[in-house]
């Protein structure tokens, strides 16, 4: 329950106990470490783990069978590198990866919030490094509105852009990761960045950031206009997305352009099915749907979906 120490929680987890989080907001000043296979972490009533002092609220080791369900992860006022981390980056997963084929780690009904009720700061909101992880219903949200008291810009958006910082929403480095019902929104770089091979996503929803003050703020270092709502890294050779939408609503600067809603490598093993972009209510433009393919979603096509049935 709220008020319990992370050390007490970690001691119990190390003894092989599962973790039940009762309703409430937990101030987490060090990482809850899930290290044993087949551990269950279950939140009730939107139990919320709020980072304190830049802590990563929860980290899962490279072990099979862990279940994280019904938990909300909340960024704090000091920058966290992540809010939920699964597995070790750049690790040789070895035996753990082989076991996880039949006993995968699962993230179910997981919610992530950066800003809204208070200032929030994170680099990568959710980082998945283990192989074969299943993500079943996740909403990863950098706040497009809140009660922080911001005033500069439309609805305080310029203050929000400079204060509620969140670079990337979901970063997947593991192989053979599957997501069903994935929502990731409003991040300042990539809302979803998929670096691993063999990924599969069924139903993806994204709204691009509402709040970039200028096009320069919303331009990649290589000069590409904006950041796609769904990015598969250039070195990936196998990936499937079934059903995805990326929306633009650049209320803070209607002249903002985003080059494409989805950006993927042109290779035979990377396939997208039934994806679209759309401009909501007018402000902002997405020039193409996937890479350089598909129509423009902008002021001339407000509320009209620009659809690519299959890519390539």
Feature map (PLM): residue ranges:
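Extracellular/periplasmic carbohydrate-active domains that bind, remodel
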Residues: 1-312
């Amino acid at each position: 329950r709220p008020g319990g120490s992370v050390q007490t929680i970690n001691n119990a987890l190390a003894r092989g106990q599962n973790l039940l989080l009762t309703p409430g907001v937990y101030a987490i000043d060090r990482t809850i470490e899930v290290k044993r296979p087949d551990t269950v972490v279950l939140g009730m009533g939107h139990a919320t783990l709020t980072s304190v002092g830049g802590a990563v609220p929860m980290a899962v080791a490279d072990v099979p069978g862990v279940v994280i369900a019904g938990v909300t992860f909340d960024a704090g006022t000091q920058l966290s590198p992540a809010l939920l981390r699964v597995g070790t980056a750049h690790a040789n997963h070895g035996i753990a990866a082989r076991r996880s084929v039949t006993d995968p780690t699962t993230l179910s009904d997981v919610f992530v919030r950066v800003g809204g009720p208070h200032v929030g700061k994170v680099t990568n909101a959710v980082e998945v490094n283990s192989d074969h992880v299943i993500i079943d219903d996740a909403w990863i949200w950098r706040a497009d509105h809140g009660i922080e008291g911001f005033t500069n810009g439309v609805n305080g958006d310029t203050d929000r852009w400079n204060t509620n910082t969140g670079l990337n929403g979901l970063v997947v480095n593991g192989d053979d990761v599957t997501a069903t019902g994935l929502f990731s929104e409003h991040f300042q770089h990539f809302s979803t960045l998929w670096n691993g091979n063999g990924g599969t996503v069924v139903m993806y929803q994204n709204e691009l950031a509402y709040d970039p003050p200028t096009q320069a703020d919303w331009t990649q270092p290589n000069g590409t206009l904006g950041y796609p709502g769904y990015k598969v890294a250039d070195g990936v050779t196998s990936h499937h997305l079934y059903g995805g939408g990326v929306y633009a609503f650049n209320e803070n600067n209607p002249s903002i352009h985003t080059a494409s809603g989805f950006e993927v490598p042109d290779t035979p093993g990377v396939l997208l099915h039934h994806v679209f972009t759309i401009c909501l209510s007018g402000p902002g433009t997405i020039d193409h749907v996937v890479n350089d393919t598909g129509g423009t979603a902008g002021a001339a096509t407000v509320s009209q979906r620009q659809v690519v049935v299959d890519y390539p």
